Every structure is written in C-alpha cells, then in structure tokens.
C-alpha cells in the first residue's frame, strides 16, 4: 500500500454502483492480462533461458478512489476513478505501456466495444496506463505520454 492509501483507506469504500463499474472494468483488464501473456510469454521465457511457466499479472496501481483519496493524490475533480470506471496500470517502461495500449485498442476493435479513456501517463518516477470504461457514453479518448507532476 502507498502512503496515501494507508492514510485514507478508511473512507475509500466503493458503493454497489461503483462495484458494478469495477466489474465491467476488470473484464477488460482480464482480457489484457490474457492477451499480454499470449503474445509475450514466449519472448519473456526466451530472455530467461526458457525457464518460464508462470503468467505475468497485470499490476493495478489505482482503481476506485473516494473523493477524499482522489483529492489527496491530486486527481481531477471529474476523474473516472471516482465512479470505479478507471484503473491505472503499472508499467515497467514505455515499451510495455505502448504494448498494453495496443492490446486494449485491439480488444476494443475486435469486440466492437468502446472505452472512455486510454492514456499513457508518466511522472519523473514512473509510467502507467490509465484506462477507463463507462457504462455508456464512452468517448474513446486516446492520449500517449502525458506528463503528470509528481
């Protein structure tokens, strides 16, 4: 847990509506995990000398945020995190972030389902993919390598 989550965890409880939004979001994240491992497990195993048998997880830095947590982390007042519609996906570098984004675009195209936001964001210390899916009125907003202070 981060310092922010420890300080604010008590009030960071999603409602039933938020949980439904999180379930919708996790379907996409599970498809991302499966496709990531299908496409890149062999490459990773070759780099590790063929000793690879465990699939890589998708690591989520942030999903639902209460208004208090969102404010504490400097989130936008209209953030999709406030409704449980967004997740920030940890990336090991720009290459992984771009590959995650490509997979999510492919999933959207193949399923003919839209997402709201697909953003690659970075700060001085890290890079992540911000991905959001709303129940309706998804905008398919794509933006790569946005700088976030912090």
Where do the PLM segments sit?
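Short secondary-structure junction motifs
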Residues: 55-57, 115
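Catalytic cores and adjacent binding grooves of peptidoglycan-active enzymes
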Residues: 78, 83, 91-150
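The substrate-binding groove and active-site-proximal loops of carbohydrate-active enzymes
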Residues: 16-19, 86, 90
């Amino acid at each position: 847990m981060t310092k922010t989550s420890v300080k604010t965890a008590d009030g960071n409880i999603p409602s039933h509506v938020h949980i439904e939004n999180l379930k919708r979001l996790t379907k996409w994240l599970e498809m991302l995990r499966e496709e990531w491992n299908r496409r890149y497990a062999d490459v990773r195993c070759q780099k590790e000398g063929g000793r690879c048998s465990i699939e890589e997880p998708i690591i989520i830095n942030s999903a639902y945020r209460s208004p208090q947590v969102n404010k504490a982390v400097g989130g936008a007042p209209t953030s999709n995190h406030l409704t449980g519609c967004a997740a920030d996906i940890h990336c090991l570098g720009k290459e992984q972030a771009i590959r995650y984004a490509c997979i999510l675009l492919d999933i959207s195209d193949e399923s003919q389902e839209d997402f709201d936001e697909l953003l690659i964001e970075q700060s001085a210390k890290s890079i992540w993919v911000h991905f959001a899916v709303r129940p309706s009125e998804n905008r398919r907003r794509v933006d790569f390598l946005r700088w976030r202070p912090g």
